[in-house]
């Protein structure tokens, strides 16, 4: 038996197929993963993401601590209360311990990390914190519900207080703010993991069930981990343990944009290793692959590139419900003739080489095909 979120009993009552995910008992789907996927692209769906780890960082050194801990620079959030930042948290070798989101909460910060990496993340964050005047508080008292899709925000606004509805109206993309709701502090973030507009809502565990059921009654479809994965892959978003891990640098995982090289005086964990990698010339990169014929691209399949003895590897692959054919992300070697969008390569499938098209890492956003 794994850990359970505050919504576990409701998932069961709604017919959710429960599976283990990073030590948590979570719904894979509620009957049809494909239908749930389309609901998010076309209307609105909701996901229980309470298994994510929320850590509040307070103290006089909170900013300096995060500036050293993360490859991206929280100074970008100065004077932007609620603004969020996506970053890798690296080891000294430049590998990705985890990817995360950090919110500027005024004089403190809220960090959201993955569930499968919770123990090592908290241990690493605590170890680094020993050299700073900071306090780390895990918020296990909060549930998190992601409401995603073109109608997600409009529906959510009808179910919250007037104050919260106004706050949601004024939220910018990648911004999150607290609001008093039902006598408690709720947090509304205009963020997500689907490629659609929507909200990620943090609220007290004891209020999560009632709100989930209100969303369902308003026409928001309960969705499981299966649809969450196909949606994020269509959007070209990384999944920890697939596109990156402790042995993969952000430069090889299409995360170079999350590294704040300036100011040069700012030191951060992994900077020396990334600088050396950059100077030596990047050896691997992440690309998108498309197979418009029959067949499904899957993780761990090898990628053959013309005039290269080194093989690439598919990191994530699936059938795309929105496009009607297979898509994948793949880590490939940087060759003399670069593998760029418009090129082709071959993938090993059942002992045969199948030709696929190379595209930028991203296939569907805001309901529209990018390929």
From Swiss-Prot:
It is an enzyme of class 2 (transferase). GO terms for biological process: glycine decarboxylation via glycine cleavage system. One of its GO terms (molecular function) is aminomethyltransferase activity. Keywords: Aminotransferase, Transferase. PANTHER family: AMINOMETHYLTRANSFERASE, AMINOMETHYLTRANSFERASE, MITOCHONDRIAL. The glycine cleavage system catalyzes the degradation of glycine. This is Aminomethyltransferase. The lineage of its organism: Bacteria, Pseudomonadati, Pseudomonadota, Gammaproteobacteria, Cellvibrionales.
């Amino acid at each position: 038996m794994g850990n359970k979120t505050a919504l576990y009993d409701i998932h069961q009552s709604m017919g959710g197929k429960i599976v283990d995910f990073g030590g948590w008992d979570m719904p894979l789907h509620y009957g049809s993963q494909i239908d749930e996927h389309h609901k998010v692209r076309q209307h609105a769906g909701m996901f229980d993401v309470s298994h994510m780890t929320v850590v509040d960082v307070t103290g006089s050194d909170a900013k300096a601590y995060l500036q050293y801990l993360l490859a991206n620079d929280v100074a970008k959030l100065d004077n932007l209360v609620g603004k969020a930042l996506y970053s890798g948290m690296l080891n000294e070798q430049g590998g990705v311990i985890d990817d995360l989101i950090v919110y500027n909460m005024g004089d403190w910060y809220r960090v959201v990390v993955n569930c499968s990496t919770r123990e090592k993340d908290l241990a690493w964050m605590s170890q680094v914190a020993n050299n700073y005047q900071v306090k780390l508080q895990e918020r296990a008292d909060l549930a998190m519900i992601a409401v995603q899709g073109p109608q997600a925000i409009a529906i959510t606004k009808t179910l919250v207080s007037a104050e919260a509805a106004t706050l949601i109206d004024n939220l910018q993309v990648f911004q999150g703010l607290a609001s008093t709701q039902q006598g408690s502090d709720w947090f509304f973030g205009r963020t997500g993991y689907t490629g659609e507009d929507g909200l990620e809502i943090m609220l007290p565990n004891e209020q999560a069930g009632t709100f989930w059921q209100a969303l369902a009654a308003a026409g928001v479809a309960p969705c499981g981990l299966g649809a969450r994965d196909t949606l994020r892959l269509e959007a070209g978003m990384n999944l920890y343990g697939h596109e990156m891990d402790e042995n993969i640098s952000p430069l090889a995982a299409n995360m170079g944009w999350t590294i704040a090289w300036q100011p040069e005086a700012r030191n951060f964990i992994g900077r020396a290793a990334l600088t050396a990698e950059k100077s030596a010339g990047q050896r691997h990169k992440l690309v998108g692959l498309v197979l418009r014929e029959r067949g499904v691209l899957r993780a761990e399949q090898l990628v053959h590139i013309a005039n290269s003895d080194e093989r690439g590897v598919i990191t994530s692959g699936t059938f795309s419900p929105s496009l009607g054919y297979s898509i994948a992300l793949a880590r490939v070697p940087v060759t003399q003739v670069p593998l760029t969008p418009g090129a082709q390569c071959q993938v090993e499938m059942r002992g045969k080489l199948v030709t696929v098209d190379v595209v930028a890492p991203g296939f569907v956003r805001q309901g529209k095909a990018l390929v």
